[in-house]
A protein has these predicted regions:
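Compositionally biased terminal segments of proteins
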Residues: 1-176
Length: 176
């Protein structure tokens, strides 16, 4: 079993919902972008508990748990590494809207595993929240087909995000 598969199995066994985000999710939506790691989103604080990963550590997985403080926009990040397998990063969100992203995700087969994948509009919300240059490029690629339903879904949810995210969305929307 791959590191990705083992991670999904553990999260499933522990009833911790997650969704594929990042370049893997972009690829599902037809936007190829090269990356070595696989990114998952979760919101359960249990993901940051070292004891959750004990069985994987026993199997030789390197687990790096980084907890955010109260001022951090994320609860934290967990990076899993094992040999030459693709790294798995679990971004642990702290906001209700991030849980909604996971709840709306649709299942797809990725690297032989069934995994919930964030919808296009939800990837846009996550990218607006991250706010980097690559994130803005990714948003432009997600919008290239001009899907009015995607725009409408982002418009409907954007008020849940911080003001700077709303401003970025307004600027992107004006550009067309």
């Amino acid at each position: 079993m791959t590191l990705f598969g083992a991670t999904l199995a553990l999260l499933d066994r522990e009833s911790i919902p997650c969704a594929l985000i990042g370049a893997g999710a972009l690829a599902v939506h037809g936007i190829p972008r090269s990356t070595y790691d696989i990114d998952l989103l979760a919101t359960s604080a249990r993901v940051l508990d070292d004891t959750l990963w004990a069985s994987m550590v026993e199997q030789g997985v390197d687990v790096d748990v980084r907890r955010g403080d109260r001022s951090d926009p994320l609860r934290g990040v967990v990076r899993l590494k094992q040999g030459t397998d693709r790294d798995v990063d679990i971004v642990v969100g702290r906001h209700h809207w991030q849980g909604d992203v996971i709840a709306r995700a649709r299942r797809a087969r990725i690297q032989g595993e069934e995994v919930p994948v964030a919808l296009k509009n939800d990837l846009i919300l996550l990218k607006l929240f991250a706010g980097g240059h690559q994130d803005m490029w990714d948003i432009e690629q997600l919008l290239v087909d001009g899907d009015a339903d995607v725009h409408a879904a982002v418009d409907a949810a954007i008020s849940e995000l911080p003001d700077d995210c709303q401003a970025r969305w307004a600027a992107l929307s004006r550009r067309g």
